[in-house]
From Swiss-Prot:
Subcellular location field: Cytoplasm
UmuC domain ranges (all copies): 6-187
InterPro entries found in the cross-reference section: DNA/RNA_pol_sf, DNA_pol_Y-fam_lit_finger_sf, DNA_pol_Y-fam_little_finger, DNA_polymerase-Y, DNApol_IV, IMS_HHH_1, Rev_trsase/Diguanyl_cyclase, UmuC
Database matches in CDD domains: PolY_Pol_IV_kappa
Positions annotated as active site in the UniProt record: E106
GO aspect biological process, one term: error-prone translesion synthesis
Organism: Pseudomonas putida (strain GB-1)
Family: Belongs to the DNA polymerase type-Y family.
Name of this chain's protein: DNA polymerase IV
Cofactor(s) needed: Mg(2+)
Amino acid sequence: MSLRKIIHVDCDCFYAAIEMRDDPRLAGRPMAVGGSPDHRGVIATCNYEARAYGVRSAMSSRHALKLCPDLLIVKPRFEAYREASREIHGIFRDYTELIEPLSLDEAYLDVSDSQWYSGSATRIAEDIRRRVARTLHITVSAGVAPNKFLAKIASDWRKPNGLFVITPAEVEAFVAALPVARLHGVGKVTADKLTRLGIETCLELREWSRLALVREFGSFGERLWGLARGIDERAVHNDSRRQSVSVENTYDTDLPDLASCLARLPELLDSLNERIARMDNSYRPDKPFVKVKFHDFSQTTMEQAGAGRDLESYRQLLGQAFARGSKPVRLLGVGVRLRDLRGAHEQLELFPPK
């Protein structure tokens, strides 16, 4: 099998990070996102200040407050998290279409065939982390490895705000020293059983034959045998086709007025047209749209069916979008919705001629 380059990206305390970004008063103190302790609420996530007290995800809010009486619990704002996730995935798509989301804040990327940075997965991961921090003002951790199992372990190795790389030459030694409790799919019950069998590390697990592991653990024994050797052939599954292509830029200094925003349009459109030109012919550009994020992180998107993709059409859309806030702008984006010609063809093929 050809060498694969897999990146696992995991946002650091995602929901809490968005809340602290949007309300800086929350930063630096123990806080969590979750339900009310008076209504059997649970913690969805918490920041690292709260984790220092032992607060964890899926813990009851009432118990979390016992551990940390000063804990501030805020209600979740899922639309804000979904919007941030969409922005992050937009960054991912600049490097590859092979993206497998695991949740709003976590995804695998297969960059094996990416031409960015001469195919360097490490530099791609570095650039993704830099762009997310610059654009969204939150941090992500990333792991780079030859397969999904190792990439996920690597992303957790230097959390928060870290990057860890496992090269093909390092796989053998890295996995040998790995505790079996870190293996994908090994929960508490399996970990306890492995401990009773005297197996603490993958090196010790390698001493067991494939047949012996299957006898002890059923079909999962086959999986354990492979993981102990760093083997994971699972592909990165991309379940959805692209719906749009866009270009965004976050400016070092806020754009104070509409005229300043309009002056930035030509360079954005040049970049957009370059990306459209690189797309395959299974997509057709459709509705143009403009995205504006104001200095206070409020944002709006304006699109129009039937409009052209020329400079004047985007100028009109930008003018309408800016009027919704009429305040300094920190980010501008231009894009176009896509018509999926392959999807349309596949639907027609469901009913072949008789």
